[in-house]
Amino acid sequence: MNGVAAALLVWILTSPSSSDHGSENGWPKHTACNSGGLEVVYQSCDPLQDFGLSIDQCSKQIQSNLNIRFGIILRQDIRKLFLDITLMAKGSSILNYSYPLCEEDQPKFSFCGRRKGEQIYYAGPVNNPGLDVPQGEYQLLLELYNENRATVACANATVTSS
C-alpha cells in the first residue's frame, strides 16, 4: 500500500495541471530588489527551470560595481557561456547587448567549465558602466546560453524607476 501512496504522490506533484510551472502563467515572479526608487521583478522564461537572483545596493543610481547573487542547477554544460540583454521601453528596443561570460581560453568566473547537474552559486560584483535609471518602466530580456545556443537561464524582468 505504501508503494501505491508514493506513486500517487509523485504523480500529483509532477502532473502539469497541479504544478504552477505547467500552466500558462509560467514560473512565479520574484523580486530581485526593491528600494532606493528602483524595483526589479523577474520571471524565468525557461519552461523547464527557475533560478534565483538578487541585487544588492538597489538604487536608481546604479553603481559601477553592482553586487548580485545568482543560483541555478545546470541542465547544460558550460564550456562557453554568453549573456544577451535586450532592454525595451514602451514597446521600442533601446539596447541590445551581448557579452561572453565564459570562454575556453579566458574564463572570467569560477563557474566556467561546470557540467550538467552541477550547481552554480555566484555572489559578487558585476562590472557595468554605472548609470542613473530614468523614471519609467522598462522590460529586460536576459538570456544565458552555451556554445551550442542551448538555454542555461532566461528571464523576463520589469524594471520600475520612480
Swiss-Prot record:
Function field: May cooperate with CD180 and TLR4 to mediate the innate immune response to bacterial lipopolysaccharide (LPS) and cytokine production. Important for efficient CD180 cell surface expression.
Compartments it resides in: Secreted, Extracellular space
Coiled coil, from the record: none
Keywords for the protein's UniProt record, in alphabetical order: Disulfide bond, Glycoprotein, Immunity, Inflammatory response, Innate immunity, Secreted, Signal
Coarse class of the protein's main subcellular location: secreted
Subunit structure: M-shaped tetramer of two CD180-LY86 heterodimers.
Species annotation: Mus musculus (Mouse)
Example GO BP: innate immune response
Top-level lineage group: Eukaryota
Gene3D superfamilies: 2.60.40.770
Protein name per Swiss-Prot or TrEMBL: Lymphocyte antigen 86
Classification via SUPFAM superfamilies: E set domains
Keyword Signal belongs to the record: yes
Bridged cysteine pairs (disulfide): C33-C58, C45-C154, C102-C112
Signal peptide as annotated in the record: 1-19
